[in-house]
A protein has these predicted regions:
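Non-heme di-metal
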Residues: 1-119
Length: 119
């Protein structure tokens, strides 16, 4: 994978580079390292690399989904109501679309994300 140093691209361009990087990592880089570790008798290290491959593959899947949302113009919209949370102040609202700005702290829509309730 290549990462153009010093360049800040568009969200679309950055996601495309990230997708390419993750793909390279799980299809070539880590499998090569796992094979080498296995060949040299380091089974635990090879197993760790195989588990990292699973994580990298998931990263690619997530970035592909994000790119799809960005390209469709529906990054801050869903077909059904969900909870949106402001990453700045924590304000939560249930809606199909994130607010244009946070009614609590006045930060723009870009500070909202689907709320994670994983505790």
């Amino acid at each position: 994978a290549s990462y153009p140093g010093g360049k800040i691209g568009t969200t679309r361009e950055n996601l495309q580079l990230a997708i390419a990087g993750e793909h390279e990592e799980w299809t070539h880089m880590y499998p090569t390292m796992a094979d080498k570790a296995e060949e040299e008798g380091f089974k635990e290290i090879a197993t760790a690399y195989h588990n990292i491959i699973k994580a990298e593959k998931e990263h690619e899947r997530r970035y592909l989904k994000l790119l799809e949302r960005v390209e469709s113009g529906k990054f801050f919209e869903r077909d059904e109501e969900i909870y949106w949370q402001c990453r700045n102040c924590g304000f939560v609202v249930k809606a199909k679309k994130a607010p244009a700005k946070c009614p609590a702290c006045d930060h723009p829509q870009e500070h909202f994300e689907p709320m994670r309730d994983n505790y």
